[in-house]
């Protein structure tokens, strides 16, 4: 199952976010996991993807300080959330604060996961990195052709 596309949504007054129907149709049950992501985003995974992903993190050596730090940061900032009957999730307050989300969000399909961004933060991220995208793509795709 792959998630793709970019969707423009708003949190409602109770801080619930409606998952786009095209994404919701790919989620087999009503439980998803929302975690602190990178670059200021949140990440949402299905139960199956979360189990795979967290297993990889938890299998890293706990004797390494950096591993403990990143494991602590990610796993402690992950919440199991339920999708209600009309396709909404309630994002916990601590995650909203970590991602500077107030109302307007972008929901980005990222293959095996979904990123949730505050719109202003994502627009700034895009503006700050747009000049480098071609260079980065060249480097990445050259590695794929070897």
UniProtKB/Swiss-Prot annotation:
GO MF terms, alphabetically ordered: DNA-binding transcription factor activity; transcription cis-regulatory region binding
GO annotation, cellular component aspect: cytoplasm; nucleoid
Keywords noted in UniProt: Cytoplasm, DNA-binding, Repeat, Transcription, Transcription regulation
Major site of localization recorded for this protein: cytoplasm
Cited Pfam families: MraZ
SUPFAM superfamilies in alphabetical order: AbrB/MazE/MraZ-like
Record carries keyword Translocase: no
Domain SpoVT-AbrB, chain residue ranges per copy: 6-49, 78-121
Alphabetized PROSITE patterns for the sequence: SPOVT_ABRB
Cellular compartment(s): Cytoplasm, Nucleoid
InterPro entries: MraZ, MraZ_C, MraZ_dom, MraZ_N, MraZ_sf, SpoVT-AbrB_dom, SpoVT-AbrB_sf
GO biological process terms, semicolon-separated: negative regulation of DNA-templated transcription initiation
Quaternary structure and interacting proteins, as annotated: Forms oligomers.
Protein family (similarity comment): Belongs to the MraZ family.
HAMAP family: MraZ (MF_01008)
Name assigned to this protein: Transcriptional regulator MraZ
Species this protein is from: Mesoplasma florum (strain ATCC 33453 / NBRC 100688 / NCTC 11704 / L1)
């Amino acid at each position: 199952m792959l998630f793709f596309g970019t969707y423009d949504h708003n949190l409602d007054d109770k801080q619930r976010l409606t998952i786009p129907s095209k994404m919701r149709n790919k989620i087999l049950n009503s439980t998803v996991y929302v975690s602190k992501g990178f670059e200021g985003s949140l990440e949402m995974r299905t139960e199956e993807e979360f189990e795979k992903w967290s297993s990889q993190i938890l299998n890293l050596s706990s004797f390494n300080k950096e591993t403990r730090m990143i494991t602590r940061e990610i796993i402690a900032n992950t919440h199991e959330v339920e999708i209600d009957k009309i396709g909404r999730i309630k994002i916990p307050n601590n995650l909203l604060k970590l991602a500077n989300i107030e109302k307007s969000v972008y929901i980005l399909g990222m293959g095996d996961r979904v990123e949730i961004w505050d719109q202003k933060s994502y627009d700034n991220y895009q503006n700050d990195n747009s000049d480098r995208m071609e260079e980065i793509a060249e480097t990445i795709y050259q590695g794929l052709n070897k």
